[in-house]
Every structure is written in C-alpha cells, then in structure tokens.
Amino acid sequence: MNRTRPVPGTPDADRYKWSALFNTTLGVLLVSINESILIIALPDIFRGIKLNPLVPANSFYLLWILLGFMLVTAVLVVTLGRLGDLYGRVRMYNLGFAVFTVFSVLLSVNWMHGTAAGAFIVGMRIGQGIGGSFLFANSSAILTDAFPENQRGMALGINNVAGIAGMFIGLVVGGLLAPIDWRLVFIVSAPFGLLGTVWAYAKLHDSGVRTRARIDWWGNVLFAVGLTLVLVGITYGIQPYGTSAMGWTSPRVLGTLIGGLVLLTVFGVVESKVASPMFRLQLFRIRAFLAGNIASLLAAIGRGGLMFLFVMWLQGIWLPLHGVSFTDTPLWAGIYMLPMTGGFLVAGPISGVLSDRYGARPFATSGMVIASLTFVGFLFLPIDFSYTPFAILMAINGLAMGLFASPNRAAIMNSLPPDQRGAGAGMSGVFQNAAMVLSMGIFFTLMISGIASALPRTLYRGLVTQHVPVAAATAVSHLPPITSLFASLLGYDPMSKLLGPAVLSHLPAHSAHVLTGRQFFPTLLATPFSDGLTIAFTFGAVACALAALASVLRGQKYVHAVAAPSGADARPGTVEADRTTSNEDTRADEPVLAAQGVGAFAGHSSALPPDEPEQLPEASATT
C-alpha cells in the first residue's frame, strides 16, 4: 500500500514527526557506531582470525576493514539519495535498515582464519556500508519533510548529536565487547537493526511529492568509479613503496589518482548535459547550500583523521607510559576520549534549537573558530601530558563541533527545494564522507612525514643501548613509519615480534625485560610522534579556520521557497509544499531570504528548475 505522511499541522503529523526523528536517530546512531567500533576492536579481531596486520602483505586487510565502510558510504550516498527522490525516501531508508541488519549478522558468523577471514570481513563490511548509505542518504531528507522549518534545526541537531556521539560510543562499546568475543562487535547491531527495520516499515511514510525523472546511469557509473579510484589511491598512498616511507610516487597510486580525477572531470561534464543529473550542479548556485557544504568539507578534513591520531597517541604512547598494559589500552583510550562526546552532547541540541531562531551563521562560525583554537591549544601539550588540560581541550573541541554541525546541517537542508532534498542530502554526505577519508590520508601523510626522519635514528640508538646486535638494530630501525603508527593504533608492542626469540634469548635478562616492557617502544616513539602531531594539529587549526570563513560567507538565514506542485491541495494524504514566510521566530536583522533563491553568490536571482513532481495517490493518513 502506498502511504503518505499526514497533513502538516494535524495531531497525526505531530506524532509522525517524532516517530521519524526517533527512528532516523537510531539509524544514524547505528551507522556511526559501526564506523568507529572497529578502531578499538581491531586487536581482538586480528587475534581472533589469526592474522598479523603488521605484516606488510596484510596491511590491505587492516586498511580496508577500517576504511571500506566509509569508502562505500562516500561513493553511494548521493546515488541512494537521488533514488530516494525518485522512488520514495522512506522506501529506500527502510531497505537500508534491512540490508544493514543482514550484513551485521553475516559479519558475526565468520569462522574462517587468516587472509580468507580478513577478506570475508572486508566484503561484509562493504555490504554493511551499502545499508548504512541508504540510511545516511535519506534520514536528513525524511526529517526535513516531517518537520516545519522552525523545528528542523532542533530535529537535525538531535540527529547530528547521535551521529557524532555514536563515533565515541563505538570506541567504548568496541573496547568492552571485543575482549569477550570479537564477533560481539558485529552482532550487537543486529537486534537494534531489526527493531529499526520493523519500526520504520510500520511507522514511516513517504512524502506526497516525488520526482519524475530517469536514472542517470552514466553519471552514477562515472562518479562511483572515479571517486573509488581516488579514495583507493589515497589509502595506498600512505603505505610504503620500495625504499620510500610512503607510496605517493608508486605508479599504481599515481595511476588510480589520475584516472579517478579524469573520470570525475568527465562526470562533471556529463552532469551539465543530461536532463536528470544525479549530481545537480545547479544546487551549488544556492549560496547557503554551497557555503554550508564548503564549510562541512573543510571541517571534516580538519577533524576527520584526528580521532585516529588521538587513539594512537593514547594507545601507543600515553597509556603505556602510565602503566596500562597494551591489551587494555583500546578500552581506556575510548574512555579517556569521552570528554569530547560530552561537549558535543551539550552543544549539539542547543545550537540546533537556537539556529532555528537566529540562523546558522553565528553558531557554525563560532564553532569552527573555537575548534581551530583548541587545535592550537593541543600544540602546547607535551607528549606525556597531564590529563586535566587534555580533557578540557577535548571537551571544548566537542562543544565547538556541536556548535557547528547541527546548525550547518539544518542550513544546508533548509536551502533545498523539497523535490531535491534526497539528492542534496546525498551530495552533502559525499563531501563529508569523502573528506573523512581524505582527512585520514592527509593526517597519516603528515604524521609519517613528521616521524620518518627521526624514527630510524631513535630506534637504532635505543636498541643498541640495550645491547641489541648492530645488524638486528639496523634491520629493526628501518621499520616503516606506517607500521609504527598502525602498532600504536592497535595497541601493539612490536618489539617482541620484530626482534624475536633468536635475538631476545641472547640478550642480558634486564635488556630483554626492558625491550619487551610497556615503556620502551612508547618512549622511543614519543619524540618523533610529537613532531608529527605538531604538523597535524597545525593543519587542523588552519582547516577549521577556513571552515569558519566559509561559514561567514553563507549569508543570512535562508529557507528555500517553492510553489505548490500542480494539483496539490490541502487534503488528507497529500503534503503541502514548503512555504517560506517571515514569522515570529525570525528576527528583523536575520530575514528569511525566500525570494533570493539561487544565484546568490553571483549577485542575482534565478530559478532552479525542479524535476517534474509526481503526486502520490491519495491515501488515508496514518501514523
């Protein structure tokens, strides 16, 4: 049965919007938890499947288990958002919940070992990411359809809080469950996914307006292949190549990057020619949409890779130096990062509500300015810091991200015409998710550049001091920097594996004890790691400052106005098109720019021709 959501302003509509909010918040929370839950659980997963991720040949599995979920989300989110516009956002969202749940179950029934088990997890994570893409691509559009303009900031704010909080909840949940059984980190999502699937099918209803258009197959293929090549090139660029610490000069990396960029260029040309493009380039003529996405892109680049750096800093150096065993560092790293979650939980909902009244610009801009200043503050922390100032900076950084994320997301969605919200949300998601992967590539590159020159010399001197033979010390000192970073990320002590019994058994007992103890490798890594952090935090501060500048340029509060579709009327089973008027929630100095429409950056007003809307068959209103 084709069901439509109730008429706005009725009790049924009021109940429906809260059902939509709670269900989409659950979906976003599950997706974000599964983006981060493996960061902490990886050591137990690799031990469980009997695969050593520090062996160069196995680095593929480490990278793709971590990044495969994000890569597929970045590639598919705009396509699936567009499908939501064409065939119903709720229908695509419901399908996503079901797909996500099925692959969560499949991930937990892996009884293989070695590379076969690693390949299975990579494949199932990609499938799980496809389900997550359906959820991510359509949740914002569903909320924007369900809530009136003066409540969208609040609704999207709660949704954003769930998304960011889930990243940190995933760290703690992974640390708690993985030591019991690594399969629990996957199966834990299944009951919640089943609940969300049944709930969504029972309660969520599609908007009464759909877009009538053909699928842009050429655009979809060019975009998917081009972006995949670029992101794959980035993941391999941070790995060693020959005698180089990184692979940016590798023909394979250069070929994938150049090939991907060429295909994306062709994609841009195709999208400007076809009648119903997947990527509606005209949307970038809307000032609020363009500025909001640029700010989101820069913010994601500035902070996306930092979670990994904080985890490596805590797991690989700070916690071992403070007496925590390597096997316990993953859980405690997640716990020590909770102040950032607390800051975001405080600021996210409040800024979303206030942005409904005062507009996004003051909150999003100040959030990025504060975030930039916190990265400057991190520059002044010693590598073996006192936890109190670290926790304060983490909390302020989370608060800053909360100030930015909710208002910025609401401003982007408010700027879109109703029949383009799925595609627009997908385009915005592409920027955010691709920027997260790009950010990790940038931050890993900066970290490797920072430690590559000092690490070999530091390792050699430390090993020789503990009476390790020169030949063995020389071999270990050529440890690729990326291996050191991965060891820190995984909470591994690589010395016992790198030296092996053949060397350790011939050393004095005291030297062998020092080399395999908690503090030897973290102490040696501390100085080179600090050099890398300086470069990374400086980059993060600059990126967030540029995001603040983009946020300033978004202009005053703006909500897209569009005429009602032909034949639409206010009756049960139909949906009124959005109307934008000045109201009591709009301040005189922050007018709603309904007439400004698109072309604001060019200084003129123009109309964005929507695809032909299709009115769904009339049906009785249900909740």
Task: State what each model feature region is.
Residues I45-F46, L83-G84, V173-P179, I234, ...:
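Interfacial helix-cap and linker-helix signal at transmembrane-aqueous boundaries
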